[in-house]
Structures are given as structure tokens and as C-alpha cells.
């Protein structure tokens, strides 16, 4: 059964090679037969050796079969510094570990896919930096087991142009249609309020925080718990194989004196572009619930 599972995954990933310039949300980096705890340690070491800084890590949705590392690199920071504003969301990249059929899948958010989504028409100016990020991720995966290097997360990929203009359907939000959570009197006041409220715990827990040097930009990755949190919505939307573990955590971007988040109907759809309307209807309240949780740490 385990051998059959690996063969199926290889075939799914290999088909992505034929798509050429069409991109998918995730890359399967490697697969390992070792225990999750062992793979976690090896992954952490490999990422650092490949030039990444680990900003944070956590167990999404309190699921014992999953683990996420959030990383940053010099190239990612430089790209954001050159562009500022909403490109601050590109300051962090997620690496997901998932146990599926006794195999640990090590996957990550596709930096070229997200780069096109967050930089849009400006991505060509920073593409070389993200290609370096992609190459370094491949290097990190090379010592973690069977190297896969295949795209997944959608049956059909999207062109860079389509990703830059992406929305799920007519009437739904684009990348730039962010939710403005709170406007503070200043950037420093915003940082102080957000960080003091997160520290209180509850249904929001800080996974990482990263401030862009020489810019009034700070990105926070926040784990969401409670009855409307990750444990509620992730099992509903993450139903395909391989799993989209690197979808989480959700972010708040403090941009100057304003805290914003990507709209749930955009952020979820970008990570799960094949979601059917039937599945989307099952989480119809989730974008609003996420917004409420995020407001709880900004107001």
C-alpha cells in the first residue's frame, strides 16, 4: 500500500512537468520513510544550511501528522525592500511536513507562484531573487529522502499573468483587496498593541514575526484556534493528496500605521484553486471568522 501511494504521488507530480510555464501553489520537495520527529530535525538543519533563516515553526490545526516551518532569506527580504507595501506578505515562505500513509511528505509554497501573486507586474524585477530561493529550497530537499521536485495543489497550473490577476470567481476579492483591520496613530504604536495582545494568548498564538529592515513593515504569522480556527476549517478544505500543509499560518501585515490581512476568499482560494463551490460553501463563515480573530489582536 505504501509503495502504491508513493507511485501515485510520483505520477501526479511528474505530470506537472508537462505544463511548462504554468505554475501550481506547492512543490513536493522530498519524501522520507523516517519518523516525523527525525524529519523535522533534519529539515530544520537542511534549511539553515541552504541559507534560510527559520522564523518560526508550529503544528497547524493541532494535527499530530503535520508540522510547518516558516523561513526567510536575504533574497526575499531584498525583494520586499525594493517594492514595499503589500509585497511584505512575500517576506516569509512556508515548508510543510505531513505524514501520509507512513511517509513524510516535505513540501513548500512555490516561491514563483507566490511571487507572481504578491508582486504581480513587478515580479519580473525580482524574479532572479525568487529563482535563487527556489534553487536553495531544492538544495535543502536533496538530503531529506527521495527527491521529488514536483508541483501540486491544482489539477491545472496557472500562467504568471493569470496568477497576478487571480480571484476565485466574479465578485470575489483580488490580492489588493485586503482587509484593513486597524489604523493606529503610528507604526510603533501598532507594533506595541499587536504584540501585547498576541502575548495574552487565547485563540491566537504567534508563530513568527519578521520586520523588514529600514521599512515600516512587519509580518506576523498567527496560529488560529478555537471553534472557528484551523481545527475547524483545515479538514474541510484540505481533502486532496498530497496535503496542503504549507497553507498555514495566516498573516497580519503591519504596513506603516495600518494592519491588514489578505481577504479569506482570496487567501484560501489562492492556496486551494480547485476548491469546488460546494466545498467553499461549507466554509462560508470562515473568512469572517478569521477576520474576527485577527481583529482581536489589533483592536
Task: Indicate residue ranges for each PLM-predicted region.
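Sec-dependent N-terminal signal peptides
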Residues: 4-14
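Sec/Tat signal peptide C-region and signal peptidase I cleavage site
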Residues: 16-20
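Terminal, regulation- and interaction-focused segments at domain boundaries
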Residues: 21-62, 120-122, 140-219
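Soluble non-cytosolic domains of exported or imported proteins
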Residues: 33-38, 128-131, 284
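Extracellular/periplasmic catalytic domains that process cell-envelope and extracellular macromolecules
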Residues: 62, 87-90, 245, 254
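Mid-chain, structured segments of secreted extracytoplasmic proteins
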Residues: 65-104, 108
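Hydrophobic alpha-helical segments and helix pairs
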Residues: 106-152
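A cross-kingdom marker for long, charged
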Residues: 209, 213-299
Amino acid at each position: 500500500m505504501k509503495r502504491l501511494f508513493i507511485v501515485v504521488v510520483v505520477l501526479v507530480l511528474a505530470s506537472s512537468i508537462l505544463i511548462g510555464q504554468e505554475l501550481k501553489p506547492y512543490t513536493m520537495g522530498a519524501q522520507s520513510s523516517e519518523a516525523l520527529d527525525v524529519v523535522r530535525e533534519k529539515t530544520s538543519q537542511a534549511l539553515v544550511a541552504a541559507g534560510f533563516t527559520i522564523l518560526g515553526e508550529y503544528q497547524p490545526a493541532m494535527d499530530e501528522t503535520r508540522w510547518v516551518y516558516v523561513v526567510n532569506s536575504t533574497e526575499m527580504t531584498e525583494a520586499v525592500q525594493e517594492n514595499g507595501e503589500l509585497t511584505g506578505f512575500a517576506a516569509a515562505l512556508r515548508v510543510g511536513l505531513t505524514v501520509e500513509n507512513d511517509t513524510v511528505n516535505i513540501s513548500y509554497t512555490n516561491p514563483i507562484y507566490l511571487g507572481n501573486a504578491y508582486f504581480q507586474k513587478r515580479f519580473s524585477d525580482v524574479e532572479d531573487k525568487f529563482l535563487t530561493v527556489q534553487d536553495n529550497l531544492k538544495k535543502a530537499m536533496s538530503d531529506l529522502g527521495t527527491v521529488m521536485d514536483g508541483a501540486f495543489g491544482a489539477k491545472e497550473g496557472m500562467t504568471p499573468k493569470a496568477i497576478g490577476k487571480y480571484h476565485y470567481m466574479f465578485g470575489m476579492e483580488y490580492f489588493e483587496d485586503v482587509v484593513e483591520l486597524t489604523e493606529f496613530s503610528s507604526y510603533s504604536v501598532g507594533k506595541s498593541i499587536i504584540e501585547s495582545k498576541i502575548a495574552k494568548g487565547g485563540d491566537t498564538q504567534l508563530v513568527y514575526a519578521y520586520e523588514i529592515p529600514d521599512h515600516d513593515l512587519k509580518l506576523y504569522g498567527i496560529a488560529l484556534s478555537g471553534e472557528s480556527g484551523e481545527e475547524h476549517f483545515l479538514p474541510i478544505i484540505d481533502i486532496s493528496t498530497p496535503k496542503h500543509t504549507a497553507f498555514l499560518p495566516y498573516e497580519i501585515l503591519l504596513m506603516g500605521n495600518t494592519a491588514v490581512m489578505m481577504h479569506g476568499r482570496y487567501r484560501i482560494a489562492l492556496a486551494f484553486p480547485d476548491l469546488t463551490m460546494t466545498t467553499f460553501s461549507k466554509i462560508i463563515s470562515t473568512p469572517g471568522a478569521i477576520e474576527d480573530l485577527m481583529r482581536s489582536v489589533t483592536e
